[in-house]
Amino acid sequence: MIRILFFASLRERLGEAEVTLAPAPELKTVADVRAALAARTDGRWAELLSVEQLLLAAVNETMAPPETAVQDGDVVAFFPPVTGG
Amino acid sequence: MIRILFFASLRERLGEAEVTLAPAPELKTVADVRAALAARTDGRWAELLSVEQLLLAAVNETMAPPETAVQDGDVVAFFPPVTGG
Amino acid sequence: MTMADTISSDLNSPDGPFWHRIQTAPIDCGAAQQWLSADIVGAAGATVLFTGQVRSEQGQVSALSLEHYPGMSEKVLAGLIREVAQRWPLLRALAWHRVGDMGAGDAIVVVGVAAAHRQAAFEACSCLMDRVKTEVPLWKKVSGPDGSDWVDARDADLAAARRWHDSGEADER
Amino acid sequence: MTMADTISSDLNSPDGPFWHRIQTAPIDCGAAQQWLSADIVGAAGATVLFTGQVRSEQGQVSALSLEHYPGMSEKVLAGLIREVAQRWPLLRALAWHRVGDMGAGDAIVVVGVAAAHRQAAFEACSCLMDRVKTEVPLWKKVSGPDGSDWVDARDADLAAARRWHDSGEADER
């Protein structure tokens, strides 16, 4: 399975902190995972995960651009630009 | 009288922390005071106060370039470049 | 997986030269300064310590809540310290970041370095702080009389962090 | 009139926004940080604290003695703080300098500022420290196994201080 985490405003607006996706041939990259999530028709998934939204991603706790490869067992996280400090 | 103070290595090498000079028509500026001191023939005054030595001066606790006016009652200080901090 | 409410494990330690920490407990800035200055060989001539505190914004901010990505935030913080210490010759460096709930005036973050000379210390501390602001997965939510909302990322912070990329480090990676 | 061995009078005070001090007693850096952070209106988002300490220089320095020009050193220090606070919007600023005898690892000077934003805090603190190094009448003498000698002024320090003149302040005077 691919574990997917959401943080901060994205987590709050989705109403979910975590979902899982079954690995599939069409889920090769971070961009693919995001597109799969944006294809969900329940709730605000399409809006909040659309490519128009400025979101960052990490794969296994390392920042990951959209083309980063994803495989079974990975943890993918999506979140808004960071605002610490 | 004009009070003259010396600090740090200059004080140590002169063997004096303070001298006084009587006001005189030829003692118009900091440079004049320095020249008067350098004219002393006892000890190392000529060497240590010569214009070749890199020294700073203050008049009444304010940094003062050589052309600064000096008058009766002033406190003039000479010292090497500062090394605090 | 919402707000982290545990103090993260310390793989690093006060005994080594680098010390990062994500913590829910209040930050003790005095302790940070003391640790930086305690260089037993006496080779550190300069320390620079930065603290970021919750601003009240004329009463518009009464509380601040900080969420992080547990595990990743510690990892990124540790990596930033290592990178900064490769660019400037540092004897010690620390970065402690608070998460969870805090109020106006509370310290959110403390970042500090010790070096032989002050120029390196100022630059390294400033760089480390700019990168903490833009690279560690942390998110602020502020509460005030009009309710609460997430803070937007500032372009000025991204520009500040880019300064350091333009002048070396990132180019070499 | 040799080594100053009195704590100079405080015309300024911990109750105001600026605090300068020439002191023979050891410097308490934690107290400096605490004072900077204690901004009751919560308007200060950033503090930057610099400390300079006696370096042992691989055992070549066992003790350091600092002479100053009593009266003038306090006056210059106070003036520098005022000038820096005119250039950057500071909520608090302090500069405490130790004089007299100290040993390796002891703090010689602590300079710190509090501001709304970090860029101003870093720049103001760095500028204040560069100017303290080159404008306050203070002189270091170091002692080691080979005897003692006065420290020469460094060109690098003068160059560092000039940076701030070139980019504004001094031009406006």
Roles of regions detected by a PLM:
Chain C
Residues 2-108, 114, 123-126, 130-173:
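N-terminal, polar/charged subdomain of small-to-medium soluble alpha/beta proteins
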